[in-house]
């Protein structure tokens, strides 16, 4: 994946990137379609964010993916896809799982999020959002697809 380098972190600001991704002999279109799935794209984006935002360190810990250097700020990277964005703990998301809203809200209030809009992959929008703001605006721990422009509004 090729991407712009060395960007300072600002909250509630969109960072727009156009990525180039390839894998073996797969067509560019096939790779792009695969990387519109947040479950797959997240693994690459988590690592790339550390490169492009040098203030971040990738840690892949329980409940968060990055820490901000020289601080105690924790971040969880989440993908916005054709089904929207969910910011409850990963252990609460998926078939047969249930969200404990009090626990999810408590957790979200202790960390911040890196929302990555991959709907138009290879175009990706990245936005740093405070967890407290997400809980206040989206208490269901879900940003629906039709709220996409609301989340990424400047």
Describe each model-derived feature in a short phrase.
Residues 1-154:
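Nucleic-acid endonuclease domains
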């Amino acid at each position: 994946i090729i991407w712009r380098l060395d960007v300072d972190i600002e909250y509630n600001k969109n960072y727009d990137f156009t990525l180039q991704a390839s894998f073996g002999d797969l067509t560019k279109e096939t790779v792009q379609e695969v990387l519109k799935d947040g479950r797959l794209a997240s693994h690459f984006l988590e690592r790339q964010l550390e490169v492009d935002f040098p203030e971040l360190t990738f840690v892949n810990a329980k409940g968060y993916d990055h820490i901000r250097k020289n601080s105690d700020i924790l971040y969880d990277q989440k993908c916005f896809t054709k089904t929207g964005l969910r910011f409850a703990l990963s252990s609460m998301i998926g078939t047969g799982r249930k969200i404990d809203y009090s626990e999810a809200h408590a957790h979200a209030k202790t960390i911040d999020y890196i929302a990555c809009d991959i709907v138009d992959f290879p175009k990706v929008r990245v936005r740093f959002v405070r967890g407290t703001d997400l809980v206040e605006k989206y208490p269901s721990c879900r940003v629906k697809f039709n709220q996409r422009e609301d989340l990424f509004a400047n």
